[in-house]
Amino acid sequence: MTLWINGDWITGQGASRVKRNPVSGEVLWQGNDADAAQVEQACRAARAAFPRWARLSLAERQVVVERFAGLLESNKAELTAIIARETGKPRWEAATEVTAMINKIAISIKAYHVRTGEQRSEMPDGAASLRHRPHGVLAVFGPYNFPGHLPNGHIVPALLAGNTIIFKPSELTPWSGEAVMRLWQQAGLPPGVLNLVQGGRETGQALSALEDLDGLLFTGSANTGYQLHRQLSGQPEKILALEMGGNNPLIIDEVADIDAAVHLTIQSAFVTAGQRCTCARRLLLKSGAQGDAFLASLVAVSQRLTPGNWDDEPQPFIGGLISEQAAQQVVTAWQQLEAMGGRTLLAPRLLQAGTSLLTPGIIEMTGVGGVPDEEVFGPFLRVWRYDTFDEAIRMANNTRFGLFCGLVSPEREKFDQLLLEARAGIVNWNKPLTGAASTAPFGGIGASGNHRPSAWYAADYCAWPMASLESDSLTLPATLNPGLDFSDEVVR
């Protein structure tokens, strides 16, 4: 029984699904998808649970959320192993994901008070008040790269605000989704407040098509995000928060310490086997001898990166991709770019058939026209040379995406120029692209999405503002508008 609906674990009535470790092939999870009727059942349960959950005080809802945080802490080792085995990422990185889940809860609670709590301003004849109210029933779509942390960034703020939820994890990480849901169950969530439906495309389409849905919170690919946007078009009554991908540029301008710059670039491009929406996809490198030396060092160090199993000792920097198919898609993208005229500096290699262990790839595309503006979701970096910083900024902005942009340079003036001209939601200076502050907005513009699905700014789209003018008594104004006469003679 792998669906959790209205407080009960039930068996899915849809297609059967088996999840294997992407490196070893070990069977980790088996179950059945939720069919359309079960998705509707989950929605009815969430709708029935909404009034009571929304009417609880914030303090009462907060108790449940904080209990969940405690369960994450006490089950950290077990959840770390589940995430690592299911995604293929090394144990050390899965542990950082669980830590991030725990830390985001305190941030979410503070954010609710600061951004969407209650405010009151006294007026001569009363007061002006601002309150926030939950939307109702929300669908949360989770991604596979951070199957615990990223859905958590939607679920926790939504629950604090008083919403009820239908959660669909990625079909590639059903085990992680179920494991997190069992912790919510232990935390004492009332039946129907949070419901789990497993499944792929058909389940997702049934969920997003629900008429009795007040909103949808999505993290995933741009293609799926666009489909959801089209599906919900013409329904302004539904909140739609999309966090999608990026074709992120990293500008290497002047390099004082080549090793430090190479380290930053590898952290930006290849951590999580390149499976972060924040990863650098385009390396913009200043022409010249210094750029040549940097690139040679980057290739040499990247060549020594060997992906390994989640529990290898010593731990590898990167593990496998989410599936062999995902790894093969990266290889195919490299082959296509090479056929277009790209110069391969480091060829990505699948270490063993039947696994997802893929070595990093680097290809130079300077002077090649018609390069697709697409996110290749894996350890693969494309390189372009530039001559002037103005040219670098134009190249950085030459994308339909707008999530992340980074600059390596000792010159503050160039960073200030980039801040003024960059089309990106996050712009870093001498910091990896894969680093972001939890207390800052996270998200982008253009094809990278809307809203800001971090714990801090997620509060904004998990509740709607209600403004009020209030007075505890009704009195006739001392001064009336022209044309109004309440004299005794007129009244009689």
UniProtKB/Swiss-Prot annotation:
<dbReference type="InterPro" id="IPR016161">
    <property type="entry name" value="Ald_DH/histidinol_DH"/>
</dbReference>
<protein>
    <recommendedName>
        <fullName>N-succinylglutamate 5-semialdehyde dehydrogenase</fullName>
        <ecNumber>1.2.1.71</ecNumber>
    </recommendedName>
</protein>
<dbReference type="GO" id="GO:0043824">
    <property type="term" value="F:succinylglutamate-semialdehyde dehydrogenase activity"/>
</dbReference>
<dbReference type="InterPro" id="IPR016162">
    <property type="entry name" value="Ald_DH_N"/>
</dbReference>
<keyword id="KW-0520">NAD</keyword>
<feature type="active site">
    <location>
        <position position="277"/>
    </location>
</feature>
<dbReference type="InterPro" id="IPR029510">
    <property type="entry name" value="Ald_DH_CS_GLU"/>
</dbReference>
<feature type="active site">
    <location>
        <position position="243"/>
    </location>
</feature>
<dbReference type="GO" id="GO:0019544">
    <property type="term" value="P:arginine catabolic process to glutamate"/>
</dbReference>
<dbReference type="GO" id="GO:0019545">
    <property type="term" value="P:arginine catabolic process to succinate"/>
</dbReference>
<dbReference type="Pfam" id="PF00171">
    <property type="entry name" value="Aldedh"/>
</dbReference>
<keyword id="KW-0560">Oxidoreductase</keyword>
<keyword id="KW-0056">Arginine metabolism</keyword>
<comment type="pathway">
    <text>Amino-acid degradation; L-arginine degradation via AST pathway; L-glutamate and succinate from L-arginine: step 4/5.</text>
</comment>
<comment type="similarity">
    <text>Belongs to the aldehyde dehydrogenase family. AstD subfamily.</text>
</comment>
<dbReference type="InterPro" id="IPR016163">
    <property type="entry name" value="Ald_DH_C"/>
</dbReference>
<feature type="binding site">
    <location>
        <begin position="220"/>
        <end position="225"/>
    </location>
    <ligand>
        <name>NAD(+)</name>
    </ligand>
</feature>
<dbReference type="InterPro" id="IPR017649">
    <property type="entry name" value="SuccinylGlu_semiald_DH_AstD"/>
</dbReference>
<comment type="function">
    <text>Catalyzes the NAD-dependent reduction of succinylglutamate semialdehyde into succinylglutamate.</text>
</comment>
<dbReference type="InterPro" id="IPR016160">
    <property type="entry name" value="Ald_DH_CS_CYS"/>
</dbReference>
<dbReference type="InterPro" id="IPR015590">
    <property type="entry name" value="Aldehyde_DH_dom"/>
</dbReference>
